[in-house]
Amino acid sequence: YEAVIDMYPLDFEEFLWANGIGETVIDSVKSCFENEKVVPDGIHKAMMELLYRYVIVGGLPEVVNCFLETKNVEFIYKVQRNLIAEYEEDMIKYAGGADKPNIRECFESIPKQLAKENKKFQYSIVKKGGRSSQYIGSIQWLEDAGIVRRCYNTRITELPLEGNSIKDCFKVYTTDIGILMAMLDYGTQADILKGNLLGYKGAIFENLMA
């Protein structure tokens, strides 16, 4: 008997565990949100610092381990860029011939997609004149590989959401927030640690929630 278990990057709560934050503190923060109470200043400041760290590190085990061992942003960035290079090698190795360049183009367009106030994925951002028929298979490949996830718009916000989704109206996010950060300009991570989100605030928090 075999059971298939899907593995995902660490979420923020799991990242807190990895950083030695106990359940008492986490439960206290949860209680504040559930009861609509103000989080104590000291805890709020610590949680915001950890959230910024989570944004730049993400939840991939190799990157989290690097962060815990070194606390060095440059080392973290190098590990993430190596992982991105491995993703791109897999695109060449495992994708069908016609899709190979399209997959990489779709993947590399994600920061630009999220930086704009678009309500859905724009194929013209991937390449001028780009069409759904040209790239939809590439997006599916990236999703099947666990590199990205799609979030669909809905006609109405009622359950079942999937039944009310608009299949040709979606946005694409990286499965791991740290990978998105590593795709941005070098130095962005150091700025985020200082609390300076620059022009990426919308993209960062959209991707976090996705």
Regions found by a protein language model. Give the residues of each.
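Accessory nucleic acid-recognition modules appended to NTPase machines
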Residues: 60, 64-210
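Conserved AAA+ ATPase small/helical "lid" subdomain
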Residues: 28-77
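Hydrophobic/aromatic beta-strand patches that form the interior of the parallel beta-sheet core
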Residues: 3-5, 55, 173
